[in-house]
Amino acid sequence: MVTVASDEFSNCEVKVQKSVSVFAPASIGNVSVGFDVLGLAVKPVDGTLLGDVVCVESATEDSLVVVGAFADKLPKAKEDNIVWSCLQLFNQALLTQGQACVPVQMTLDKKMPVGSGLGSSACSVVAALAGLNAFYSKYQDYSFDEKTLLKMTGQMEAQISGSLHYDNVAPCYLGGLQLMVPDEDVISRVLPGFNDCYYVMAYPGIEVSTKAARDVLPTSYSRADVISYGQNLATFVDACHRQDKAQAFSVLTDVVAEPYRTNLLPKYQQAHDYLMTAGAHAVGISGSGPTLFCVCDNKQQAHSFALWLNENYLQ
């Protein structure tokens, strides 16, 4: 064997690949009773990853790779991908703080269906920004605090949906049941949830964009609806703190969005009525839909409802 080589390297060169991977979970936005102000992070009982994964690796130039089950549903041009926008925002924030940017390759493993109502865009945004923050913390000795990063996720979510709301990005990033508060120094507070309940989520396979789901909402509401919304939300928050499950779920109803979005979701009303009659604590639309969620007492009931939804709601 004849090899032609240069003497450019006098010693053995070892390149250490620096990388960080972050998983961001799915979430139920609104949770029926809290339009734009409540969100719940969810984790499948079978341990599968329901969410997106972003890997950040050292590179010679910035780049984006998209893989995964739903990669083909995303824009082909990297400039149109929200993960690329997250990188631009993060780098801009670094420069504002006088920090140097290093080139990275970002790989998005898109496991979440787009337009599902399970916080698909929030998963990508949170995984991207949290991944970048973890990468810089580990290898560049710099990171943004939790509040700053949460604000970045909200900014990115607003870019997608057209309005600023944290009900998906906050639980996705912070976990648990989150209540959004009108305080920029706080943004979100965790509520005590009910750990002995099961949430069944059924994604029918159709796509409903957040913007389209918002466009069908009225620009004004009746006094009765406003009072009902405020009373139900206040009662739910109070019941969470008192751990009164029966009262909490008794007010888990949506007077703001569900009455106007039902027409976007074939078979939703039929499924809602069946599940409530069959003993579900509550049934609602996850985020802007089309995913339906219902609250169950035990795993056996949850399994039974899941089978019914598989036969009657999925398309």
Protein language model regions, located:
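Alpha/beta catalytic cores of group-transfer enzymes, especially the acyltransferase/condensing modules
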Residues: F144-D196, V283-I285
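Short beta-strand-to-loop capping motifs
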Residues: S58, P204, C294-N298
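Glycine-rich beta-alpha junction loops
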Residues: A26-I28, G176, Y203-V208, V255-V256, ...
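ATP-binding N-lobe of GHMP and related small-molecule kinases
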Residues: V2-S116, A130, A134-F144, G175
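Glycine-rich, charge-dense phosphate/pyrophosphate-binding loop(s)
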Residues: C240-Q315
